[in-house]
C-alpha cells in the first residue's frame, strides 16, 4: 500500500521517473548521489527507496538517533555514526558496513547544498576501505529523472576512477538549483 502511494505521488503527481536500479544481489555499496543542491533531494531519495523497495541508508551523528527521533531515522534507513575512541568518520562508517549484511549508503560528495569547487573524497575512501562498489545516482531536475548507474568497482586511483568511471554519469545533469551544483 505504501509503495503504491509513493509511486502515485512520485510518478503521477510529481512527474518523475526512475531509470535503472540497484541489483537485489548487491547488498552493500556506496551510492554517490549528485547533484545535491536542495533539501528536496532527501525526499527524492526517500521516494526512490520506497518505490524500489530496497534498503538504502544514510548516516548521522549518534546524537540524532536518540528518543524521540531515533526510531524514525532508523526506520527510513538512518545509521548512527559512533566516533568514540578517536575514530574518524571513514573508519566509523566502514565499521557499519562490516557489521551489517545489507548496507547501501547514499552520500552526496558535495557535502553541502551550496556551490563547491571540489568534491569531498570520503565516499570514495569508504568504498575502498569497505571493499564495496560505488553506484552513481543522478537527481536530474531538468528531465525529472533519478538515474541509477551500474555499480563501479574502484581501483584506488581516485582521479582515474572519478574521471573515467564515475563523473561521466553526471554529464548534463541539472540540479534543482543549477548555480549551486558541482561542475568539474
Listing of model-derived features with the role each one plays in the protein:
Residues 3-6, 65-69, 136-137:
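Short, glycine/polar-rich helix-capping loops at beta-to-alpha or helix-loop-helix junctions
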Residues 24-84, 141:
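Catalytic core of membrane glycerolipid acyltransferases/transacylases, capturing the structured
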